[in-house]
């Protein structure tokens, strides 16, 4: 494994690890020579893939190629762009962008600010960049591409790796009720996501009741600042990088619609709260009402006031509370409240009560009285509620 290791001496700066010899030079960049007619091939610092250029920059400003797509990635691109604009004091000299050929936040920002855009996968590095940066890109980069950057390609990951490897770390942080999160700067490796060595990390206490969107916005800004900090002393961070431990590895797969089904017999109040804050803004929580899917909207939290006969209620039992103007639903360990639902159209809690729970309605349709319970959805060929596996995932690790 090749490393840049810097030593300060009276004669200048000594670099080891770029080849099998020592090189000393007081300038920012170093040319490596060996005996004979040809220039020695320099190896990329992140692995032993041959790197063709003979001129390695050893301090900022850097030539950066940025890979990204969404608003989380856009925040890092904004910080890199701002650094490039700082004449004489920034860490970026050249900045170009690689993104998908779609209308995406990263593409819009790049075009608005006259940054050169490469459409993935048509990327031609041509020995013009010192380091790559990839954020929320979603595509594996091949080894021959990674090897063309002297300092490799850095990744900003919104978790404290190795916890929550995968495409949805912020959602799983909230879903599992983590009290601590953070950002990791790592070097990527080919063939697998989120397994490379760690260069820098920053810890962030998760605020109580934070949603995935709120946490994601905070970590995006934190990650962008941590990236700039890392680039300021990149050779030192590369030299002192550490491999990820196998202890504490967890997976953060993409969120899916099956996660939105509530299992009233198994979900606790806290688990439903975490589930809503994790996915509720993108995928409404769902249950069954009289055999029809119904979406639960405007979650109002755990209902703390005791109800007469509440202890004996069947999970999924629904009541209307006038004081809070919400529907109260019993779950494994208590009651949770929602202020609106979506059946065929959006209904407030009061509208739902008047249409389906009012004593006048129940007198007219006495057979419906036994059906006034929210039920977990069950597959046609199994008695197992859909979402039960996801219900277990909600439990704190």
Task: Name every feature range the model reports, one short phrase each.
Residues 303-336, 344, 354:
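Low-complexity, glycine/alanine/valine/leucine- and proline-rich hydrophobic stretches
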């Amino acid at each position: 494994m090749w490393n840049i290791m810097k030593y300060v001496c009276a004669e200048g700066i000594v670099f080891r690890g770029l080849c099998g010899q020592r090189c000393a030079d007081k300038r920012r960049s170093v040319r490596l020579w060996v005996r004979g007619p040809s220039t020695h091939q320099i190896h990329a610092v992140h692995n032993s893939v041959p790197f063709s250029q003979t001129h390695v920059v050893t301090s900022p400003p850097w030539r950066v190629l940025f890979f990204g797509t969404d608003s989380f990635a856009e925040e890092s691109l904004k910080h890199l762009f701002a650094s490039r604009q700082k004449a004489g004091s920034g860490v970026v000299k050249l900045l170009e962008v690689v993104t998908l050929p779609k209308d995406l936040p990263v593409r819009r920002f790049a075009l608005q600010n006259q940054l050169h855009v490469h459409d993935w996968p048509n990327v031609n590095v041509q020995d013009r960049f010192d380091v790559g940066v990839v954020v929320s890109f979603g595509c594996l980069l091949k080894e021959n591409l990674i090897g063309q950057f002297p300092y490799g390609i850095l990744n900003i990951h919104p978790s404290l790796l190795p916890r929550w490897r995968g495409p949805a770390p912020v959602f799983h942080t909230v879903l599992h009720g983590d009290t601590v999160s953070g950002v990791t700067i790592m070097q990527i490796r080919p063939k697998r996501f989120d397994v490379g060595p760690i260069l820098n990390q920053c810890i962030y206490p998760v605020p109580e009741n934070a949603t995935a969107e709120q946490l994601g916005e905070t970590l995006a800004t934190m990650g962008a600042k941590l990236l700039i900090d890392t680039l300021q002393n990149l050779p030192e961070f590369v030299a002192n990088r550490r491999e990820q431990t196998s202890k504490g590895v967890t997976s953060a797969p993409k969120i899916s619609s099956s996660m939105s089904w509530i299992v009233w017999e198994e979900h606790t109040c806290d688990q439903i709260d975490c589930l809503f804050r994790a996915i509720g803004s993108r995928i409404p929580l769902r249950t069954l009402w009289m055999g029809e899917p119904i979406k639960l909207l405007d979650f109002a939290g755990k209902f703390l006031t005791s109800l007469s006969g509440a202890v004996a209620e069947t999970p999924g039992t629904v009541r209307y509370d006038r004081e809070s103007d919400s529907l109260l639903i019993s779950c494994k360990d208590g009651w949770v409240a929602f202020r609106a639902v979506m059946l065929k159209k959006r209904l407030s809690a009061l509208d739902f009560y008047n249409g389906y729970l009012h004593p006048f309605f129940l007198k007219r349709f006495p057979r419906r009285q036994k059906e006034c319970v929210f039920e977990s959805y069950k597959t046609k060929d199994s008695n197992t509620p859909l979402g039960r596996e996801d219900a277990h995932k909600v439990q704190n690790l």
